[in-house]
Amino acid sequence: MTFYDHTAIEPKWQAFWADNHTFKTGTDASKPKFYALDMFPYPSGAGLHVGHPEGYTATDILSRFKRAQGHNVLHPMGWDAFGLPAEQYAMDTGNDPAEFTAENIANFKRQINALGFSYDWDREVNTTDPNYYKWTQWIFTKLYEKGLAYEAEVPVNWVEELGTAIANEEVLPDGTSERGGYPVVRKPMRQWMLKITAYAERLLEDLEEVDWPESIKDMQRNWIGKSTGANVTFKVKDTDKDFTVFTTRPDTLFGATYAVLAPEHALVDAITTSDQAEAVADYKRQASLKSDLARTDLAKEKTGVWTGSYAINPVNGKEMPVWIADYVLASYGTGAIMAVPAHDERDWEFAKQFNLDIIPVLEGGNVEEAAFTEDGLHINSDFLDGLDKASAIAKMVEWLEAEGVGNENVTYRLRDWLFSRQRYWGEPIPIIHWEDGTSTAVPESELPLVLPVTKDIRPSGTGESPLANVTDWLEVTREDGVKGRRETNTMPQWAGSSWYYLRYIDPHNTEKLADEELLKQWLPVDIYVGGAEHAVLHLLYARFWHKVLYDLGVVPTKEPFQKLFNQGMILGTSYRDSRGALVATDKVEKRDGSFFHVETGEELEQAPAKMSKSLKNVVNPDDVVEQYGADTLRVYEMFMGPLDASIAWSEEGLEGSRKFLDRVYRLITTKEITEENSGALDKVYNETVKAVTEQVDQMKFNTAIAQLMVFVNAANKEDKLFSDYAKGFVQLIAPFAPHLGEELWQALTASGESISYVPWPSYDESKLVENDVEIVVQIKGKVKAKLVVAKDLSREELQEVALANEKVQAEIAGKDIIKVIAVPNKLVNIVIK
């Protein structure tokens, strides 16, 4: 039996593509464009795992498909190479993070090339290259000039173990850091912020213009968190102080019986009475040790302290005790709430715990037993009594505005983006602080502001980054003799990844971020493939920066990514014990088809789980490529199931994909290829071209491969294979298995040219129609023969064909035929005696 030798074929074609620059981005202005983008990877020390190639293979198939359809294709790759892991490694080993990063990139690139992806490597970007981050810094200076980058003393999520502050989005639901799982505490610090809130409404509205999964759009909508309601001003009794509350339900103001301020609210110290001062100070201290997520956990016990002061309810003049509680955040809304315990579960629990008044203002429910959170007509509400929700809100807003104690307002959950990191391995923020108290951006002519090489990269512990230790870089003097210090904070890893897709369009431009005409030609990105875990962070930040650049006239589109696709996760083989705990694969043995814990002897259940080093179930693509070949890995990952499903890795599935490719190889290299078409494969060939073309376009790669298998099965039943169909089939399979595709194309054509730009096959609509049908012949109600006949034969013709059949004649010999019932295209029933 013939098998193809992937160890010879694959390196041969990879060298051919590299030597001939086969995948150089097309520039023919008469052709349509297609920009296929992968989320570029962080080049970790671990290298690629088999999850990476799933998305990369999908965009590669589309890129190869579109090239064959006559598109200019931009399909680039690069490296998101700043960030904490390299710095952590450098601190642990004493090595330079730049060296570590360069080694990792070389390894990633080797692995990627071994998989046969059609990237245009002339467009490679690296976020740590000064020629790249010059433009990251340039964008920052533009944000600064527009007032969208500013410094503020803000409570930050401080991670002591990392020596840096992190963004809200990087805090996990359990209150630990996304990177490393360390405890997060709140701590006030001077930080750089980006005013993403200025774009909240546009970030929300323009989601309607993009073809993204609805689940991702919803996550962004929820993160932006638009609320329509009213601001209400409360005066503090016996003082000249007041505070503002935002509420979506101003109609329930008659039911507001107490107010709660965030412990960090600026008014707290000013209104706290002397006998409550100690309790308030103690509570503030405790609150500062908790993350926002821990503080707002609905399940946690309600805690709080009374300030000793009262606010006056503007609508009825009643006194409301003012409390502080950690479930109110200074960073959300106004940092103050009016509590309506009769109609809000959290307020109700708090009121019950601290014995505060509960006054129902909506009809229905028993507020002594639980908060009534449904809608009802208003009661106990003076001029709102008897009104429904919408009417009451409108009337209350009108009253608040007339009385000068409130106004209609829209607020957003979205907070400004905490942009500074107290670390070394990031882009230096191009700002100088002068001793006269002013700050200026580094002029464009002096960019890039290069990150200085230093051995001392441990966090300073003072809240400044290690750059504070590099004095010859840090200290500067202006022409007029005024001394200054450079900003020591660096940018977060999200900075370089917020605009990299633009640099791919014009990566070697030294004069500007990218040429306007090229940006017009290539934007927006046609397909962006990556993990759903980036739904809020990267995708929201990139959209924000893109809109700023749109306002500056740098980019021609409002949105960066027209279509987004999230691939599923490839799960590893893993095992669970009776408690549900996962057991590492090296602690498992197989006996008689069952799995047992090596140490305890307990029988284990096999269950897929995320691949991880600790479970020792990570599959390295290098091993798969060596044993089965890159084409097998590509076909297997596309055939596992729908691209967006999470599916368990299977060696059997891998072997099945290899066997299929061997059958393809045998079909083309051992079957007699003929210039004459017998017509036997007309229907299945044209069906295959139609199905594969449509399914690749829709990213239904698993069903496209299934159809290719149908063709192979049909072709194997024939003695000869029509050469046009052989070539067309090889073209169809080439995007999935490109090395094999090239090899078989040469076997058929000996052209010496790559298959990559050969026009995609077309199908003949008329050949899709079935010209023959199978009918059954029944005698005494039992099927005695099956006949393939021309479609739409008349009753008489059908009867004639059936009675002429040898099997039928043997059955009816010597018998009397009573009658024959013929149903065109279905059956012939013969009644005999």
Curated annotation (Swiss-Prot):
Pfam families: Anticodon_1, tRNA-synt_1, tRNA-synt_1_2, tRNA-synt_1g
Principal location listed in the UniProt entry: cytoplasm
Highest taxon of source: Bacteria
GO cellular component: a single term: cytosol
EC number(s) recorded for this UniProt protein: 6.1.1.4
UniProt keywords, alphabetically: Aminoacyl-tRNA synthetase, ATP-binding, Cytoplasm, Ligase, Nucleotide-binding, Protein biosynthesis
Catalytic reaction list: tRNA(Leu) + L-leucine + ATP = L-leucyl-tRNA(Leu) + AMP + diphosphate
Binding residues annotated for ATP, in chain numbering: K613
Protein name: Leucine--tRNA ligase
Upper classification of the organism: Bacteria, Bacillati, Bacillota, Bacilli, Lactobacillales
